[in-house]
């Protein structure tokens, strides 16, 4: 039980830090970044660096088109996953290659991939920061959705 309480507290702490950092980042240097991710390795308590991430947009026939891909930086982040023009109203999927990530660390994970599927920009253009907390056998995710800056109008 103590393990789960510790994990819950760690999750709250990390996600609250991701939230505050995302708020400042989007309002400053990355004001034109409509989609970014922040991934944390809960086993080691550090950012999940070198994690491959793909962004897909759902078509009308429910198939998926790859929009972009990237790898998290040393701080566990990827900025500019989509341009303002690409990131229109629709359903999107972020695919995190978790098995590849954990295998490189010598661990055998449960999940091949972690997919985060969400609807974007259905209430007007917004900026999205998705935070993901990973372990080899679990994940948790949250999002910060911020309003458009005047520069985007």
Swiss-Prot record:
L-thyroxine binds at residues 38, 77, 140. The modification Sulfocysteine is found at residue 33. Residues 1-24 form the signal peptide. Pfam families: Transthyretin. One of its GO terms (cellular component) is extracellular space. The keyword Transmembrane does not apply. Keywords: Hormone, Secreted, Signal, Sulfation, Thyroid hormone, Transport. Detected in plasma (at protein level). Expressed during metamorphosis in tadpole liver but not in tadpole brain, nor adult liver. PROSITE patterns: TRANSTHYRETIN_1, TRANSTHYRETIN_2. The N-terminus strongly influences thyroid hormone-binding properties. A number of compounds can compete with and disrupt triiodothyronine (T3)-binding. Binds the synthetic estrogen diethylstilbestrol (DES) with the same affinity as T3. This is Transthyretin. It comes from Aquarana catesbeiana (American bullfrog).
